[in-house]
Amino acid sequence: MVRSGKNGDLHLKQIAYYKRTGEYHPTTLPSERSGIRRAAKKFVFKEKKLFYVGKDRKQNRLVVVSEEEKKKVLRECHENGPGVHHGISRTLTLVESGYYWTSVTNDVKQWVYACQHCQVAKNTVIVAPQQHLPMVGNPWSVVTVDLMGPFHTSNRSHVYAIIMTDLFTKWVMILPLCDVSASEISKAIINIFFLYGPPQKIIMDQRDEFIEQINVELYRLFGAKEIVISRASGSVNPAENTPSTIKTFLSKHCADHPNSWDEHLPALSFAFNVTHLEPNKNTPYFQMFNRNPCVLECPPEEGSEGTSVFARIVAAIREADGVVENKTPASSQMENNNSDELSKSKVVKKKAKQLNPFHLKVGHEVLRQRKNWWKDGRFQSEWVGPCVIDYITESGCAVLRDNTGTRLKRPIKMSHLRPYVRESSEQDSLYLLQGSIVADHDYIGLPEIPVGTYQANILVEDATIGIADNELLISSKDHELLEYRNSKISALVEDHSSLEKQTFSLLDSSNQVLEYLS
């Protein structure tokens, strides 16, 4: 460790001189000799060169002293390869792996900060070109492509399906695919081009490398260049994607017809296009061609199986779409309210905290709860005392005094207190009330002791305290003493009007007084 203000190179020279000669360098101060001896244990000479081995003696770092050698090391570790400049962390790791000097960390930071190449590269921000999506104002201008599958392999070896949706008209085309390679998808897109022509842009939710392969195939087959773009640019509202009704119905159709699901895809596409999938809007067919198709509806003949396959498909699509439309805002609002009420009913009501269950007041004797050992996954507690309530804070905590009159440091919650009930076997229980402090000579000077099972009586509201009969005292002196005691007890009874049982026995106390006077 180099002291503050000392040259690090001089420190290494002093260590090298001490390791080589066994004596201290002339510049070494007497106060530095012990530090030189301790530091020298971390260095060794190998082939007339000083190496740092560390405390574990497992390192092997060459000690560099001169400024020229430091610059050479920094240049080699920072510029690792043609045009490659490491940052501070990587450069420092490379330097510390083979070299040592005292200020290596600061030197690496200053070297990287002063590197012109790093500063220019840091301030250069490469912004990806933003793709401007043309405004969707005409049919078949912007089309989205979604892939679904894998489904059960059909008789024609088809496993996947491609869905092309026009964002303006919601016109849908569904084609089967054998796989999801770039060439297979490009061929399906080209077949749609031959029917309706190429759109301005095609949006796909795929990675950029895969989209680039599709663009290459489309340029090779059709001559369309960079027509497919990624949906990750955020230029398309997710609500404008393929309607969920189409995907849900297609999944159900493929599951119901595992071997022939690809045979009915043209019928499914046409059925979707002539159905009102969006309320208050024309069908996709009308928006695409500005007219409605001529649909021939012939009544089924007697003895026939019923309506045609296409009619059943249209009916199933309308039924599936009607389930979605019937979910009105009022019903959805009602469901939300029901869910809110259900969630509220599931909330477990916490039991209200009993801040002062025993109605304790200033001057009452209490026991306090102390948690002092860990057992069975929780702290175990015991009741210690007695203590006297000195005063009660605004937050409802009690400040206590122990049996020696010393005030405890921390306020105690009222829920951590319980009344102290004196046993008949104890000594004289005559209380001398002094302001808000109760002094009892029975336990003055005694330490706080844990109270066990003998604490049997618990005080509750509406406590009644019996008063000893005055006939037990014969002399006038005894009578005066009893009146004094009863006057003090009556004040205590007013404070304990909510307690149920007797806090101390007056009868035993009077008997003890008689024995004392006799």
Curated annotation (Swiss-Prot):
Organism domain of life: Eukaryota
Gene name tied to this protein: Gin1
Coiled coil, from the record: none
Integrase catalytic domain span: 130-292
Organism: Mus musculus
Any one GO BP annotation for this protein: DNA integration
SUPFAM superfamilies on file: Ribonuclease H-like
Keywords from the UniProt entry: Phosphoprotein
Protein name: Gypsy retrotransposon integrase-like protein 1
Keyword Phosphoprotein in record: yes
Modified residues (Phosphoserine): S498
Molecular-function GO term, any one: nucleic acid binding
